[in-house]
């Protein structure tokens, strides 16, 4: 089974309901979406859609706590998210369903391995936040996933099937695990917390 060609999505005009998962690579110097587009994104996420934001710059993060929050891609992402109703986020815990949706995974590498995968923080069963986010309460799928590991860069291949971009640090099986992370994310977006 081979994946088809990716299709471009105009988030300001296309019908988003047909896409249960949107992969959004962040470009640091791209203009911020219009207020109307941001409202469409907010509605999409509140109605059960999931957006995977990839800043693709984990390798640029300064070492130590908070280093990944200061990369150019993360600064640009924060500007976008500041206009949205985003729930509290947390690094995907080891027991998160994303670690076992299809493949058993300990982490989520892409071209880079040092970035963390962020998801909606799991509210307590009696938390009012559950009532305010009915789509999330129904299927357990995070409406937002954030990484800096450049998944698409790890997945990209040339026409002859060879990898398009190098991996950093190019650990054994890193690209294979990047594909596995992608499969888990798609399965998670489609099936929820089965």
Predicted stretch roles:
Residues 39, 43, 75-79, 183:
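Solvent-exposed, polar/charged alpha-helical surfaces in well-ordered, non-transmembrane soluble domains
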Residues 41-44, 108-111, 162-168:
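Short, low-complexity, polar/charged sequence segments that are solvent-exposed and flexible
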Residues 46-49, 115-116, 168-172:
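Glycine-rich loops and low-complexity Gly/Arg-rich segments
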């Amino acid at each position: 089974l081979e994946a088809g060609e990716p299709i471009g999505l105009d988030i300001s005009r296309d019908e988003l309901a047909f896409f249960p998962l949107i992969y959004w690579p962040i470009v640091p110097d791209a203009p911020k979406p219009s207020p109307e587009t941001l409202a469409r994104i907010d509605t999409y996420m509140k109605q059960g859609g999931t957006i995977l934001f990839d800043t693709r710059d984990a390798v640029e993060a300064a070492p130590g706590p908070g280093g990944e929050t200061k990369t150019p891609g993360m600064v640009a992402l924060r500007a976008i998210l500041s206009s949205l109703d985003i729930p509290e986020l947390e690094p995907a815990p080891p027991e998160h369903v994303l670690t076992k949706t299809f493949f058993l995974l300990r982490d989520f590498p892409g071209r880079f391995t040092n970035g963390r995968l962020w998801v909606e923080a799991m509210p307590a069963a009696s938390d009012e936040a559950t009532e305010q986010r009915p789509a999330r309460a129904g299927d357990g799928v995070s409406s937002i996933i954030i990484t800096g590991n450049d998944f698409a860069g790890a997945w990209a291949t040339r026409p002859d099937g060879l990898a398009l971009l190098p991996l950093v640090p190019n650990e054994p099986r890193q690209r294979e695990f990047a594909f596995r992370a992608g499969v888990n994310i798609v399965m998670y977006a489609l099936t929820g917390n089965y």
